[in-house]
Each structure stands twice: as structure tokens, then as C-alpha cells.
């Protein structure tokens, strides 16, 4: 897995490439925490680019980041599908206040 950082005046983007597998999936969480430190009003976006595999731990990290308000941009059918399903799950969990 490779994570790179790009900055513009409106966005800070973390570009994730490769396989999002345990135990390295936690690196994405750590990279997001570090990237949030100095946003200066910019939006933090995670771009999933050429991601070929996502483990359960990887899905858990993505779901956690979605729940914290981070936006994802995805390339590829597989990655789009996984992030879309996790976004739906996050929306359902937010709507379920009975627990």
C-alpha cells in the first residue's frame, strides 16, 4: 500500500494505492489523523486509486473515516462498490438512534 499527500488551496488529498490489508490498514487512519492537523479550512479527501484488495480491517478503517466525515473519491468498479456499500452502512447507522 502506498499513501501520498497532495495539497491545493481547497483540498488536502490522500491518494491510496495498492492493497488495503491488515495490519497496514491502520496506516491510513494514522495518515488521516496527521493530515487533519493543519487543514487551514481545506477539505480532506481520500482518493482510492488503483486499490486492488480491501480486507475486513481495511473496510473497518474506511467506515470509521466515513463516520468521521471524510469524503472519498474512488477509481475502479471494485473500490467504488466497497465505498458505496460502506457509506450506505454508515448512513443506516446514523439513522438508527434506538440503540
Specify the residue positions occupied by each region the protein language model found:
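STAS-like cytosolic regulatory interaction modules
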Residues: 1-99
